[in-house]
Amino acid sequence: MSKILKQLKIVGLVLLLALTLQSNSAIVYAGEKSNVGGDFTLTDHNGKKFELQQLRGKLVLIFFGYTFCPDICPTELSSLAKVLRSLGDDAEKVSALFISVDPERDTPDKLKNYVPFFSPNLIGLTGSESEISAVADAYRVQTKIHSKKKDSEYYLVDHSANLYVLGADGKMLNIIPFGLPTEHILQVVKNEINHLNKL
């Protein structure tokens, strides 16, 4: 009997270790993250010029996607919206950006009808193909268009689905991979807000 209990304890410790490693690896603290990101100028969902530097002093959350995305984008934007709602008064210290990787279809008008569905505090951004490509490269976002036929508006875009967290100085703090539970994202954001409050 004691042998069985000992084996169960070992199995339990192994599972606990696995879960710990998994939770610690969920947030990317890559040594190269200081080389990811940077300022940019795009067009917001109201058709106005938008510069990242105008958000200095705030924590900035950035997600890249597109309005025709069938699954990942709605899921992540819903999670992001829940995070913003859960922050209460601290939400005013955070700005959330949705940058389109499909500028051909995602016009400002298209974004204007899309982003408020998730949150009134979400800013939709688009631009020319060269502008979007430059920002995607700076943030190391991978994109690939699939099944696009000539003159067709129906196609899919594969893209990286990380959530980028920028500090009040515009520098990269965290790169959160797709699939992290909303509660974990919220905790990361709260931790960064607490750090911001101490500055």
Predicted regions span which residues?
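Bacterial N-terminal signal peptides that target proteins for export
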Residues: S2-G12
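Short, internal strand/loop/helix patches
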Residues: K112-S160
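Conserved helix-turn-beta segment immediately C-terminal to the redox Cys motif
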Residues: K58-L59, T75-I99
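Thiol-/selenol-based redox modules, centered on thioredoxin-like
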Residues: K149-L199
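Bacterial N-terminal signal peptides
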Residues: V11-Q22
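Short active-site neighborhood of thiol/selenol oxidoreductases, capturing the structured segment around
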Residues: Q53-P74, L80
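Thiol-based oxidoreductase modules, predominantly thioredoxin-like and allied folds used
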Residues: K93-D106, N121-S130
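N-terminal "domain-start" segment that seeds a small globular fold
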Residues: A26-R56, S78
